[in-house]
Regions:
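N-terminal pre-domain/capping segments
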Residues: 1-108, 172
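Active-site beta-loop-alpha junctions enriched in small/polar residues
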Residues: 10-15, 48-50, 82-85, 120-122, ...
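Acidic/histidine-rich catalytic cores of soluble enzymes
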Residues: 20, 44-45, 80, 136-180
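Generic structural signal for helix capping and beta-alpha/helix-loop junctions
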Residues: 54, 87, 124, 161-162
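Active-site-adjacent beta->alpha loops and helix N-cap segments on the catalytic face
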Residues: 59-62, 124-133, 160
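An active-site-proximal structural segment forming one wall of the substrate-binding cleft
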Residues: 92-114, 133-148
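Active-site groove signature of glycoside hydrolases
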Residues: 107-128, 148, 153-157
């Protein structure tokens, strides 16, 4: 720890790339990154949930394995980058709501404070009806997140003013901003 700050890394940066991608959940060898992070004296890893192979990601099916890696290395997980929603936007793919509900529950078990929800590229809020649908979905999920003290941190490609307006429309203290 540097003063009051903790240092961490995005998952996939300390191990060989998965399919040529730096930012990806290293399926099959994700535990190796906890060991590498500990060797570099990093304190945190931002876990990733990709759309591809989401069903075998321990965030959705093996929380005890992540807890074990945390206990063995001392490297924590306080944030999750849910890149899953770039491919399956919450406002367009009904199953995504269930996935986010599971992530919120998993967050409580892991001590995760922030789930980053990308609203960029394929999941960009492209028009008014898309935005309305997103607001409706995120408001209901924000209640659950707030009750469990988890933030839903939005990463959007909106300009600052429309982004602020979106946050006002959502109206939840558990919906925050992530600038990448």
């Amino acid at each position: 720890m540097l003063g009051r700050f903790q240092l961490g890394t995005m998952q996939g940066r300390l191990v060989p790339k998965l399919n040529g991608r730096y930012q990806a959940h290293p399926k099959g060898y994700w535990r190796d990154e906890f060991n590498a992070a500990a060797e570099f004296e990093l304190e945190l890893i931002e876990f990733i949930l990709d759309y591809e192979d989401a069903d075998i990601n321990p965030l959705l099916n093996d929380i005890p394995a992540i807890c074990s890696a945390i206990a063995e290395t001392g490297v924590g997980v306080e944030s999750v980058c849910a890149d899953y929603f770039m491919v399956a936007p919450l406002q367009r793919v009904p199953r995504s709501i269930t996935v986010l509900e599971k992530l919120i529950d998993a967050s409580v078990q892991l001590g995760v404070r922030d789930i980053v929800i990308p609203c960029v590229d394929q999941s960009s809020l492209v028009d008014g009806s898309d935005t309305i649908a997103f607001v409706n979905v995120i408001q209901s999920l924000a209640e659950k997140a707030n009750a469990k003290e988890v933030n839903l941190s939005l990463e959007t490609d909106l300009a600052p003013r429309p982004f602020a307006e979106l946050l006002d429309r959502i109206g939840s203290k558990s919906v925050t901003v992530n600038y990448d």
